[in-house]
Amino acid sequence: MKGIIKDAVILFIITLIAGVCLGAVHEITLEPIAQAQEKARTATYQEVYPEAVSFGENAELTQAIAASAQEIASQGFGNVTVDSVQEALDASGNVIGYLITSTSTEGYGGSIQIAVGLTGEGTLTGVGFLSISETAGLGMNAQKPEFKDQFSGKTAQTFEVTKTGAMADNQINAISGATITSKAVTGAVNAAVYFYEDCIAQ
């Protein structure tokens, strides 16, 4: 009986030590992971809006996100949300445009989160990806310039995906074999553009 109790105590101590060690490792790795994610996010922001020196929050615009959520959901862009909005600033701290992040849950592989840059005049400066888990060689091609750069330089408008070749300024050529991904990304862009037009450009 004493042997059984002794073995149980030893097992408990080993389990306790292992749990403490795992918890410590988790805590140690949390900060580097967060730093890496923040670095990647900053790099995407800079890619989307290269003219900006920094980005800053605007409390009024942040509050407008929740207020506009229902209206954006009713626009037919799919299951999309606007997640955040930041002002794009020049070296003097002047606002030169905006960076809006949005998410579509209708990607083939799950949610897709993007960042959209817009100038003060309503021209798209670019589209970048913050999170995407689509099929390699198909939906992941959304990250390639051939697809995402179709939005750059265009004025704020509602975009649509076409599989027959873009004939109008608001048409976006679908990725071959990845129409679902193409529509999800375009829906997220449309949500960001709508927020800009409804809450910023007014």
Give the location of each predicted region.
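Flexible, solvent-exposed loop/hinge segments and secondary-structure transition points
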Residues: K2-Q202
